[in-house]
Amino acid sequence: MRKELLLAASAFVVSVAGSSVAQAQCVLKGTVIDAATNDPLVGVTVSLQGTPTKVFTDNDGKFVIKSPKTKCNLQFSSVGFESTTLASNHAGEYDFGFIPMASASIALKDAVVTTRAVARKTPVALTTLGAIAIEERVGTADLPKVLETTPGVYIMREGGGYGDTKVNMRGFKSENVAVLVNGVSMNDMEWGGVYWSNWAGLTDVASSIQTQRGLGAAKVSTPSVGGSINIVTKTTDARKGGAFTYGLGNDGYNKLAFSLSTGRTADGWALTVMGGKTWGDGYIQGTDFRAWNYFLSVSKELSKNHLLTFTAFGAPQVHNKRSAYDGLTVQGWQEVGKYMRPGEQYRYNATFGYDRYGQVRHSQQNVYHKPQLQLQHLWQIDRTSSLNTVAYLSLGYGGGESGQGTQEYSSAWYGSNNGILATQFRNADGTFAYGKIQEMNAASESGSKMVMSMSKNLHKWVGLVSTYTKEINDRFNLYGGLDLRYYVGTHTNEITDLYDGAYYIDRYRKNVKPENFAGAGTDAFVNKKLSVGDVVQRDYDGFVAQSGVFGQAEYDFNNLTAFVAGSLNNTAQWRKDRFYYDAAHAESEKVNKIGFTVKGGVNYKFPHIDGWGGQHNVFGNIGYISRAPFFSGGVFLASQVSNQVNPDAVNEKIFSGEVGYSYHTAAFTANVNVYHTEWKDKTMAKMTEIPVDGNVERTWINMQGVNSIHEGLEVDLSYKPAKWFSLRGMLSVGNWRWTNNPVGYFYNSAGQPIDKFGHPLDQSQGPDHARMRFNQKDVKEGGSAQLTAGLGFNVYPMEGLRIGLDWKYFSNYYADYAVTANDISLDGVKTFHTPWKVPAYGLVDLSAGYTFQMGGYKTTLSGNIENLLDQEYISQAYDGAGHDWSTANRVFYGFGRQMSVKLKVNF
């Protein structure tokens, strides 16, 4: 944790420095920073060449060293960074200012280097945030919030629960944005998305976050489409120390955290441990949460050429949600204001309520714990080659609540339907009437009409990434490696509460076919009386096995850098069902898909420095990706209930290219890039609600062969004219649109194919399977702001004090289009038009921090105010029939003003 702990100087260093005071002829000082992130580097060894004198940089990266001679050489060294030497010929006191250290290209360092890129050298569009920037910006929000000022990135909080954030990049949704921790993928192996609630604890252990937009430079075998987010956790500290943090904020937000490090011992051992707890009531009504996080890193320098590191981290959590499908219409939000305090109507939660015993009830609780264990071996084979191997294990436990009901009450758990507040079980005060459900079930002579179940998802995931690096000569480097993954996800749905009924009869049991399950179809099977702990609706395992190789050649000479890279992988996918199939028919066929990537790029740094001390830089990259379809909605169209393989599943094809320019001086940096991405044969799902036998049911439309184009311009800049002031800004202009007219097939909420009346069928894509052609060519893609801008500054008016302000602007957000009940038919056609453009909005965030000494310990008091002006704005919406505000549905408003304060004591 180089950037977090206050490191006390050892007695030896103090005595050496003290003994030299009398004879010192010069005092040299400065601040050592990471060349990639501009963050201070803690624990860097600063030594006088030819003498035993050395000191270490403090928590701010600063050092002071005394030399008996005016002419001397200072050497800077730290694990994972290239050593730097500065010559000095100064009498008296001299300040070197900022001294950048670059990450080592071949050295004992973290596994994350296989996915990190270097600014002004790697030919990709990237943004890197260090630990200090993360701490300054995050406040009480989820970790992705700090990326909001990154070009091309759009953050959504969806229903607004803890960790329910979604990240879109260049218009691509979360399942097409790779999220990595220390170079290891976190994306779900079945559908590609990321549940940030599983990784909320990373806020406290992240040393940097790097976003690579577009193709990126990650050396892995399974690439992303929109870009990648690589979170680098803090390494085992070189010096001992610790920190304690307490934070609090609005709506009962509390946070406790601690960190301890033994420092590196004489025999090469080091241990770092961190932990914390976060809890609160939530900004949205009825979204209270409890979360814990832990982090452990143990390293051992086996020799000067071998480093072994074990890392474990996790973030168990319990949080209540507001369903992502329970957004209302604009008018509907005004109407529910009568249930809330003045000005708080947008916090309303349609499924928050009480039972008949006066106890708080929810139908959207999520409980999960997904720890990850990593064992890394770094081997410096010789001066020009190294082998970096990380093996990892991830185990997931938990799930989310899922209301079940008989056919007539199948949709009664919904808080809203197509943006209209559900009233069947609604109290006069607007709360959901859980007590009425209990009363109905208790009076029923045929068991519970509605019960609560838990959709359990148990994951077991093992993998290995190994990268060999070879420096051929001073111009050529070669990389090559293996990327292996094996995953099994067990998905069940177990009854947790009968809601005062005697038993429950699962309506999905009648869909089990006798030819697949011996004994199915009988009255005893279909009408089996179930109780708490029994399985309903689904019970299956999803298997994904990936094996891949990757390679990259780099050329770096004078001012030219170029690379050519490729990867090849095989993805095997199959499922094993215990609900709709007996043991003899349980396992599906195994589907293998080959994917590959070819990409290359060039970066040229102009050799001459202009009159302002600036350097010009240009880059370009181009690539082609063939990616295997996902398990869910791709290989298996009804992945929750059927072993039937999609006969039309094909690889997605992505072509992408971009060019960029940057200008860099000691105080100013500007980056400009334009990109063009063509995406073909995408599989995509849309949710809608249709009437089925007098009830409203949620259904899914799986579309195949969807094509789109994403292109745009991105600009980011930073300016630091003086030590007391820094300025930053960004602009992103996108043009994201659909380019063809695909066909979609309809499935019910259990994943079963349905006919035009909403009744389940035996076979996907059969003659009676309801389908529809989507005429959407040239229609704007929805779900992300296609124009974003930002401007921010930090002011340092006095020693230890920082005040920061950020303005963010979002425009050209088109509502996601949806399909209504009138659209479903056996072979219909739906023509789409440009969806409603949500009103543009701007937000202002304020942050401040003051560092001082308290009882001899370095202490930082910091605070954040998010949405300082309490701006009212729409952050998410779906298009309606009129393509305007009055017909838009599933609308969510963004959070109002949020405040937090934090005290951190380092020791």
Predicted regions span which residues?
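Conserved C-terminal beta-signal and adjacent last beta-strands/turns
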Residues: 8, 313, 359-360, 603, ...
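Short, acidic, small-residue-rich periplasmic hinge/interaction motif at the N-terminus
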Residues: 33, 37, 45-49, 75-81, ...
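Short acidic/polar hinge/loop motifs at secondary-structure boundaries
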Residues: 64-66, 166, 185-213, 232
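A beta-strand signature from Gram-negative outer-membrane beta-barrel systems
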Residues: 99, 200-243
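Transmembrane beta-barrel wall of Gram-negative outer-membrane proteins
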Residues: 241, 248-279, 284-323, 331, ...
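Acidic/polar loop-and-plug regions of large Gram-negative outer-membrane beta-barrel proteins
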Residues: 299, 307-376, 401-454, 517-530, ...
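Gram-negative outer-membrane beta-barrel transporters
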Residues: 556-559, 676-678, 697, 701-819, ...
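Surface-exposed extracellular loop regions of Gram-negative outer-membrane beta-barrel proteins
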Residues: 572-579, 590, 604-657, 669, ...
